[in-house]
Amino acid sequence: MQKVRNKQKGMIAGARVLGASLILSTSLLAPFATVYAETGEGRVPNVTLPTGVPTNYDLTWFDEFDGNKLDRTKWDYSLSSFDPKARTQMHFTDDPANVSLKDGILHLTALYTPKQLKWNPNTKKNEWVDRENTYKDPKTGQTITYKAPFTSGAIQTRDRHGKVLTEFVGDFYAESRIKLPFSESSWASFWMTGTKGGGSPKSGEIDVFESKGYDPKFIQANIHTAPTQEKDEKKKKTQEKYSDQYQQKLPNNGDTQTAFHTYGVLKQGDKVTFFYDGQAVYTLKYSQIKNKEAFVNPENGFILRLTHIVGGSFVKDFDGGTRNYTDAIPYKDSYKDGSRSDMQIDYVRVWQPNAKPVTTEEPTTTTTTTTTTV
C-alpha cells in the first residue's frame, strides 16, 4: 500500500493505494501546472485548480474512463441491494447494461428489470423470480420483503470483499464532472466514506452531492458523523437517529440533467469546502461539528463512491413539499431503455498537497476485467 506524505508536515496527507486510486474533476478547470499522465487509455489534459484550492496541490490520481471496461485496479462494482431500510428498489450489478464505458464516459444506468435468475435448492435449477429486497425492522425484529424491480450501477474504490483499493488520507481536493439522470425516482450521488472508526456514519461520510431525478435544481451537499442522541423532554426518552447531518443545497441554474457540471470537495485540516462548477459554495468548519473525530483523525482515509440509486426515502420533498417518488414502480416506463435514467461521468480526479504529481515519460498499460453474477 503506497502512502503519499505531506512533505512539509511529515505526516500522512495523501492516498493509500492498492492497485490505484480515484480522482474527481471538472472540464472547466484550466492548468495552473502542466500535468501529463498516461494510463495507456488516454492522456490527462492540462487542468487548473479552482480558486480557493491551494496552489501546492498536485494531481495524484485520476480516471478519464477512456477505455471500454472499468479499471478494476482502481474500482470495483457495488453488488446486490443497498440501504433497504430506506426502501430503495434496485439491485446494483456489474452487468454492462448497468455499468459501461463508451466514448470516454462512464454510464451508471438504471433499468426496469423485474425478474432475476435465482437458484432453487429444491429443483436444483436457476429459476426466474421477482426481484425483491429484504431487511429486518429494528423495532419489531420482523423481516420485511418488498418489490425491488430495478437494476442499476455503482462503483467505489473498495472491492466487494471489503478490501480498500484506494483511500485518501489528510488533505485533498476531489472532483467529478457529471450529467445527472432525470428519471423521477433516481437518486444519484458522488460521495465518500471513512475507513477508520467502525463504518459510516462513525467513520465519517462526505456527500459531495446528492440529487433527485424529479427536481433538476435539487443538489445537496452533506456531512454525516456519528449521531448525538438528544432527549425528547415531552416523551421522556432519547431520540435515536442514524447520524448528525450538516446538509446544504447548492445553487445551480437547473440544467444539471441536460449538461455536464463539476462537483468537488476540498478537505483540509480544519474544514470541508464544497464546489460547484469550480466555485466554492459551502464551507463547514470542524468547530461546527459536534462529533468531529472522523475528520480530525490523521489515519482516517476516505474511499470514493459513485452511485445511482432508484427509489427510497430520499426521493421526496422535505420542508413541507408534497412531491413523493419514493416508490419508483409507477414510473417504471422512465427506466425502460436508459435514455432518461443514465448517470454520466466524464472523469474523476484527486489533487493532494506537496505530493509527487502524476507524470510519466512513457505510457503504462492497465489490464481491466469484469465479471457478471446472477
State where each predicted segment sits.
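Long, low-complexity Q/N-rich tracts
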Residues: 366-372
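Hydrophobic helical h-region of N-terminal Sec-dependent signal peptides
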Residues: 18-24, 28
